[in-house]
Amino acid sequence: MIRDTKQPIKVPAKPASRSGGKAKTVKPKTIKPKTSAKAAAAKPASAKGLKGVIAVAPPSFRRERALIKRGIWPIAGCDEAGRGPLAGPVVAAAVVLDPKRVPKGLDDSKRLSAEKREALFEEICATAQVSVVYASPERINRDNILRASLWALTRAVHALPDLPRHVFVDGRDRLATKCDCEAVIGGDGLIASIAAASIIAKVSRDRLMCKLAEQCPGYGFEQHKGYGVPEHLDALARLGPTVHHRRFFAPVAAAWQKIEGAPPPQIRDLFEADVTVEATA
């Protein structure tokens, strides 16, 4: 018979002695199940409502400082933005942070509000070396999104004022750079230099998509930044694709097929942008 180990186990009383003396009455003992150390440790947390709470530490500058102590400098972090949208370029950024002026609040750009990203963008550009490279939709169509992204990331590293001796890149793919390159999965949430690059890439691309929204009204680029949300798909079906849409995505390809005799237009393969920051009092 299988017992529920959570229920107390009652031990029956011993039978009365057959000797001439009086039988002693033994009260049944109650044995409580033992609580394991793990269960005991988990109990207070559960009682306080902390069960399932995971603390996420912000990116740090520790790995950069470890390399600096070994005499390795400059050290860059690089990341990209815009792999998944239906429209617009993929934007890569490389950043060399000043060890004495690492901005506070750095984090993966996806975990920050737009206002926080904008503020950090200004601070990073004012205190660090920054480069930004845009890979056009035409290059994405020709090479595929992965190759276009790696190409832009590599160009961003080589476009820095001083070629770094070591590069941290977000993801699993190392770059074909002239310096040592270390790929770090989830690096934008671990390494400060990569987090800074993710912010520069994200804000640069968002600003560009807002400019494209002025050139292509009706698509809502300023809202969804080219991602395949229902509003964008609806506009694509009504208005057709633009020169900024990526042809290999199924919704865009279907939209082109509806336009008889109209070949997809070609656009500039690459354009690089210098990050400019207006001086603030």
From Swiss-Prot:
Keyword Metal-binding: yes
Chief localisation class: cytoplasm
Domain RNase H type-2: 73-261
Cofactor section: Mn(2+); Mg(2+)
Superkingdom classification of source: Bacteria
Family annotation (NCBIfam families): PRK00015.1-3
Protein family membership: Belongs to the RNase HII family.
Name of this protein: Ribonuclease HII
Name of the encoding gene: rnhB
